[in-house]
């Protein structure tokens, strides 16, 4: 009878869950993209904590596509996951995915990026507004007020891009920066390179670039080097590549997040919710400036 019960549970949960697991000990994670090392580290942090606490973690990659994200959430609810960790592709678009989970009474936790709509039990992220201001303050510390700056923005509609931009705007106002341009490069290294190439050619004397993530900053770095210019570059995330660029003197700084901790806290929070414990609606994760 016990063997029959275990087999039935496995069939209900699908191929992603082994016969030794049940729906009660399955946590699902939908990641915006696994092409970005930041989110790979976030996923690894979640996996490590899930292993430690004895949970099965099912991970799906949304490939920066809201439609794929929606399909992933539908898939995960069918698989029988009891709680969802979502790192949204975009804060507005993810509302449809959250609504699916809400209708099925599956608790949702958002990681790094928030959801503009739907019922989310807890949101775990860095203070992106504070981080954006930290980046601007660092530029002012190095170049003084009235610096000529460019901002490379992340994916439009994400809370991370909006909030980092809001924080940087506070620094712009405080230090009277001359903003030559602020354009999206979608958190992507190649787009960061291309956008920066165009702006360096059209905007002339650029003193500093704030990129809303390290991938764009590294793309900007290549463009600056190719143009044989001296420009102070500040990134955001504290990825391995970003930190290496800072320590080698190529980038001035990165505002370091803790993606592994964000993923880990997601699983810890899920564990508490599944046990019926109360959790905070917002769980902040500390930032720090890494410079040479």
Curated annotation (Swiss-Prot):
Keywords: Periplasm, Signal, Sugar transport, Transport
GO BP annotation list: transmembrane transport
Listed name of the protein: Ribose import binding protein RbsB
Keyword Transmembrane helix: no
Organism of derivation: Haemophilus influenzae (strain ATCC 51907 / DSM 11121 / KW20 / Rd)
Protein family according to the UniProt entry: Belongs to the bacterial solute-binding protein 2 family.
Subcellular compartments: Periplasm
Signal peptide: 1-23
One GO molecular-function entry: monosaccharide binding
Functional summary from the UniProt entry: Part of the ABC transporter complex RbsABC involved in ribose import. Binds ribose.
Chief location of this protein within or outside the cell: periplasm
Stored CDD domains: PBP1_ribose_binding
Entry GO CC: outer membrane-bounded periplasmic space
Quaternary structure annotation from Swiss-Prot or TrEMBL: The complex is composed of an ATP-binding protein (RbsA), two transmembrane proteins (RbsC) and a solute-binding protein (RbsB).
Top-level lineage group: Bacteria
């Amino acid at each position: 009878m016990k063997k029959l019960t275990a087999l039935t549970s496995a069939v209900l949960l699908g191929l992603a869950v082994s016969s030794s697991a049940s729906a009660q000990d399955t946590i699902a994670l939908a990641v915006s993209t696994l092409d970005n090392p930041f989110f790979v580290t976030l996923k690894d942090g979640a996996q490590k904590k899930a292993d430690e606490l004895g949970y099965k973690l099912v991970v799906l990659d949304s490939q920066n596509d809201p439609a794929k994200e929606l399909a992933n959430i539908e898939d995960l609810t069918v698989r029988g996951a009891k709680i969802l960790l979502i790192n949204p592709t975009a804060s507005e678009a993810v509302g449809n995915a959250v609504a699916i989970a809400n209708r099925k009474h599956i608790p949702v936790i958002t990681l790094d990026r928030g959801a503009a709509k739907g019922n989310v039990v807890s949101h775990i992220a860095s203070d992106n507004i504070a981080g954006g201001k930290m980046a601007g303050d660092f530029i002012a510390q190095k170049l003084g007020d009235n610096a000529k700056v460019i901002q490379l923005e992340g994916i439009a509609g994400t809370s991370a891009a909006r909030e980092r931009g809001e924080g940087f705007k506070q620094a712009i106002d405080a230090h009277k920066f001359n903003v030559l341009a602020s354009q999206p490069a979608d958190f992507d290294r190649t787009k960061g390179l291309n956008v920066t190439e165009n702006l360096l050619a059209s905007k002339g004397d650029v003193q500093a670039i704030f990129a809303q993530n390290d991938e764009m900053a590294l793309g900007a770095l290549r463009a600056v080097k190719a143009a044989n210019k001296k420009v102070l570059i500040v990134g955001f995330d504290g990825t391995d590549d970003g930190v290496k660029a800072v320590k080698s003197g190529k980038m001035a700084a990165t505002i370091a997040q803790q993606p592994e901790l964000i993923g880990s806290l997601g699983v810890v929070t899920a564990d508490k919710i599944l046990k019926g414990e109360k959790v905070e609606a917002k769980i902040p994760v500390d930032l720090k400036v890494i410079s040479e």
